[in-house]
């Protein structure tokens, strides 16, 4: 019997926390579906979502100012369990009649939590035990405000040396507050605390599993598509691979895979993709040579958003042409949940677009194909689990992400055939050395960026003006935040040496040491 994987669900209201997406991933790992929405979302949307529980995220602001963000007041009146984390706890306390003040001594980093009442959230959870027999937990704090007076009906359930009210609960109304962050790995028991809230307090049944997601996706695809054919564009990335495999599992020979050779793929990528998918997928694959078409469309375009939208337009037009030849009505896309989050805007406009994703906002409004996006609700790690469950090779599943517009957005400014050729070579050298040194799977994404600037150098006995290549490598769990990868200097020196010696047009190599935020992972 098929499970309803969305039957039990948690709503996470985002107050601007860098950890908001991490909360969502933790809830998913518990086995329960959840969605992330901005904290100013309207009441109708929340009621339509019909959550079994609500989590209020942390945030960078202070509750002590009148103009800062608040939770929708009605969520405290609908009989739904609510968990406030950091800022979420503070706004809950303030809105329900408590007091919040700036603390004289902010807490950032590790703290030891003393549990005063373990009921519900902390039941059976401890890292150590105090001499008085109280459970002690190692937790991660990041706050400058504290709840100084509890709202009516609440009691203190935990404290630290600097926060007498580090956790609070109204057991009757099932409202809970945590001043620390249970979602981060620096709180070792955080997953268990969240599971207590989601499973025991909200009484959610954990149906959100890889097996059930596959079953649900197959059923959904079959119901939508019927006997019609579907085109899926292959890019060599994990998202398109899992999308194609999932669609193929659902409708078999009704799937036609299309690989568009845009001229903007990585070195030798077309041959590699054809080999992998014809061997492992067993589906029909059509390769379309569209190099001239893409170059013509991108000529004179330097704005990153325009390049993304043009790439999306050209992709769709190619698919539509193939669809007309084959009488195909549907386009399968590898849009994933972080794409949706980053491309979303609230009705109030308080959450702004970071960049337009090729799989979301880059699509033409007059697209003639109907769209299916079986991965739209999934984070990247969930997509990879699906791929492994579907039998795709691990090398493909753990391949670094590659943007839909390809090298067009790794060339700063206007794209040219010369720039593409230089970048392909530099990128291939970087990836080859990462694999040879066993660093490839230690970083989450790595690539080269072409900078259309010339810098003076010396080759032989002569001054030489050549282009600049930037190398980018990051470590991340969910691609919502990322840290630059601290690769050994000897390794970077080797890569740099190869690039400037093997690519005559390049005179300088630099390494990007910027986290996300403030930067995005891609340069454009």
Curated annotation (Swiss-Prot):
Residues the entry annotates as binding ATP: 235-241
Pfam families assigned: GATase (PF00117), GMP_synt_C (PF00958), NAD_synthase (PF02540)
EC number of this enzyme: 6.3.5.2
Reaction(s) catalysed (UniProt annotation): XMP + L-glutamine + ATP + H2O = GMP + L-glutamate + AMP + diphosphate + 2 H(+)
PROSITE patterns assigned to the protein according to its UniProt record, in alphabetical order: GATASE_TYPE_1, GMPS_ATP_PPASE
Keywords: ATP-binding, Glutamine amidotransferase, GMP biosynthesis, Ligase, Nucleotide-binding, Purine biosynthesis
InterPro entries with a match to the protein in the record: Class_I_gatase-like, GATASE, GMP_synth_C, GMP_synth_GATase, GMP_synthase, GMPS_ATP_PPase_dom, NAD/GMP_synthase, Rossmann-like_a/b/a_fold
Cellular component per GO, a single term: cytosol
Enzyme class: ligase
Domain Glutamine amidotransferase type-1: from-to ranges: 9-207
Active site: 86, 181, 183
Pathway membership: Purine metabolism; GMP biosynthesis; GMP from XMP (L-Gln route): step 1/1
Ranges where the GMPS ATP-PPase domain occurs: 208-399
GO molecular function, one term: ATP binding
Functional note: Catalyzes the synthesis of GMP from XMP.
Assembly mode: Homodimer.
Protein name: GMP synthase [glutamine-hydrolyzing]
Native source organism of the sequence: Coxiella burnetii (strain RSA 331 / Henzerling II)
């Amino acid at each position: 019997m098929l499970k309803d994987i969305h039957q039990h669900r948690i709503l996470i209201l985002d107050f601007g926390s860098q950890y908001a997406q991490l909360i969502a991933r933790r809830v998913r790992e518990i086995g329960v579906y959840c969605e992330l929405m901005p904290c100013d979302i309207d009441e109708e949307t929340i009621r339509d979502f019909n959550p079994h529980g609500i989590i209020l995220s942390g945030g960078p602001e202070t509750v002590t100012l009148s103009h800062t963000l608040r939770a929708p007041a009605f969520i405290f009146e609908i009989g739904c369990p609510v968990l406030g984390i950091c800022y979420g706890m503070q706004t809950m306390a303030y809105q329900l009649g408590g007091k919040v003040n700036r603390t004289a001594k902010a807490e950032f980093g590790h703290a030891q939590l003393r549990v005063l009442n373990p009921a519900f959230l902390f039941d059976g959870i401890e890292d150590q035990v105090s001499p008085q027999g109280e459970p002690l937990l190692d937790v991660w704090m990041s706050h400058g405000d504290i709840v100084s007076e509890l709202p009516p009906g609440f009691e203190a359930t935990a404290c630290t040396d600097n926060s007498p009210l580090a956790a609070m609960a109204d057991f009757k109304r099932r409202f809970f507050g945590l001043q620390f962050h249970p979602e981060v790995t620096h709180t070792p028991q955080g997953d268990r605390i969240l599971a207590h809230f989601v499973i025991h307090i909200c009484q959610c049944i954990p149906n959100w599993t890889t097996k059930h997601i596959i079953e649900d996706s197959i059923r959904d695809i079959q119901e939508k598509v019927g006997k019609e054919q579907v085109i899926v564009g292959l890019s060599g990335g994990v998202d398109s691979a899992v999308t194609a495999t999932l669609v193929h599992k659902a409708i078999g020979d009704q799937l036609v895979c299309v690989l568009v050779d845009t001229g903007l793929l990585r070195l030798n990528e077309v041959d590699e993709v054809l080999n992998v998918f014809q061997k492992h997928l067993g589906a029909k694959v059509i390769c379309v040579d569209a190099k001239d078409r893409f170059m013509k469309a991108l000529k004179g375009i330097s704005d990153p958003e325009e390049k993304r939208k043009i790439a999306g337009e050209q992709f769709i037009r190619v698919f539509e042409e193939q669809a007309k030849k084959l009488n195909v009505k549907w386009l399968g896309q590898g849009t994933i949940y972080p794409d949706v989050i980053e491309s979303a805007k609230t009705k109030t406009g308080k959450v702004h677009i970071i960049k337009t994703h090729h799989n979301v906002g880059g699509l033409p409004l007059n697209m003639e194909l109907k769209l299916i996006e079986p991965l739209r609700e999934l984070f990247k790690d969930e997509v990879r689990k699906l791929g492994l469950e579907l039998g795709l090779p691990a090398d493909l599943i753990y391949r670094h992400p590659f943007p839909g517009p390809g090298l067009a957005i790794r060339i700063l400014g206007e794209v040219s055939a010369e720039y593409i050729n230089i970048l392909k070579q530099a990128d291939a050298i970087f990836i080859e050395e990462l694999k040879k040194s066993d660093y490839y799977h230690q970083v989450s994404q790595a690539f080269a960026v072409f900078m259309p600037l010339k810098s003076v150098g010396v080759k032989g006995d002569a001054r030489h003006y050549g282009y600049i290549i930037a190398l980018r490598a990051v470590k991340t769990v969910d691609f919502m935040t990322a840290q630059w990868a601290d690769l050994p200097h000897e390794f970077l020196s080797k890569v740099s040496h190869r690039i400037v010696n093997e690519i005559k047009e390049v005179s300088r190599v630099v390494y990007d040491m910027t986290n996300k935020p403030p930067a995005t992972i891609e340069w454009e």
